[in-house]
């Protein structure tokens, strides 16, 4: 899986994470699935929006600009 990024905007902050978004409407959660098989779950009531938007190259540039490893 390529390292594309998903931006998740919550009520009080935002996250940019390298993962595939999965919306589970029955459970009311947004799941971000990572390459290593783990995931992060967001309560849908707190999510304002999400967008699967960065290519792998754009995400790597974003990480370099933010000083992430």
UniProtKB/Swiss-Prot annotation:
It holds the Pfam family Phage_Gene47. InterPro entries: Phage_L5_Gp47. This is Gene 47 protein. The gene is 47.
């Amino acid at each position: 899986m390529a390292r594309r990024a998903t931006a998740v905007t919550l009520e009080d902050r935002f996250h940019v994470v390298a993962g595939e978004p999965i919306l589970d409407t029955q459970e009311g959660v947004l799941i971000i699935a990572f390459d290593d098989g783990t995931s992060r779950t967001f309560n849908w009531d707190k999510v304002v929006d999400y967008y699967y938007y960065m290519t792998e190259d754009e995400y790597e540039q974003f990480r370099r600009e933010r000083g992430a490893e």
